[in-house]
Amino acid sequence: GVAGAALATTIALYLSWLTSILYARRNYEGLQFPLLPHGYDKAQLAAILKVGVPLGLNNSLYSVGHVAVQAVYNMQGSVFVAGCSIAGRVTGIAGIAITSFSSAAVVFAGQNLGAGNYRRLQRGVVQITCAAGVVTLLIGLVATVFCRPLLGLFSSAPAVLDAAVRYTWWVLPFIWTYAVFNCMMSFVNGTGAVKYTTVVNLLILWAVRIPAAYILHALGYGTSSMACVSLSYAVGLVAMLGYFLTPEWGKLRRKAKELGDAVTAETEPTLI
């Protein structure tokens, strides 16, 4: 049953952890850490906690928030829930691209910040987010146009398909806003400014998505409550754009300008 599946998952995680440590100890000399730690670096631990605690808190509260939104979906009946579940498989197509771009953004930001390449850092955020937006916009439009045959691969029940199509039309055409917003958030996380992104993530969920879902349900539009998802994406995008007006980003821009001026001075010919 459920308890057995949970126990099996826990055992698998511990075995995976133990196997990974043993493999690393045997094959990589630079990773000869003990099975149990004997000490720690206070400065390094503080740096890890500074980034990890806000992100962990964010993920925990975000999961609780999703339960609250799911409760609204459940109020609409099993047919509606089934439709949303099926639609989620189609929107997951765009989700693959978003995950890929977001992973690239956080690595790109961290590497270039560490290397002091501020000019590339500044250009990269524009290039990555634009690429993510264009790709997901195309995916969203194509999947929306052909959503009924795509959704028909998972269910043939007319009522379920109607609910799934409604979900798709409310979410997929606007998925590009989530792609741009999430890439910006990943990029900013890569620079270490996790407090800002944590506040934004909690804001769009607890101040936008959840209230909007319950308001739509209270007004009798519960079967369109998925509109709260697209609304939260748009608000998140605007909020993340606001980061680039903050003093933190201003410092990076000044460093990029100083680096650019230095490179220009080195490459300009000397007049005799």
Can you say where each PLM-predicted feature lies in the sequence?
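Alpha-helical transmembrane segments of multipass membrane proteins
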Residues: 21, 67-71, 93, 141, ...
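Small-residue-enriched core segments of transmembrane alpha-helices in multipass membrane transport
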Residues: 89-92, 169, 202-211
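Hydrophobic faces of transmembrane alpha-helices in multi-pass small-molecule transporters and flippases
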Residues: 19-22, 37-68, 73, 93, ...
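Short alpha-helical transmembrane segments in multi-pass integral membrane proteins
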Residues: 2-53, 109-174, 216-272
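Helix-terminus/linker motif at the lipid-water interface of multi-pass membrane proteins
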Residues: 60-93, 111, 149-158, 217-219
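Hydrophobic alpha-helical transmembrane segments in multi-pass membrane proteins
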Residues: 55-67, 99, 131-140, 144, ...
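Small-residue-rich hydrophobic transmembrane alpha-helices
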Residues: 83-147, 178-200
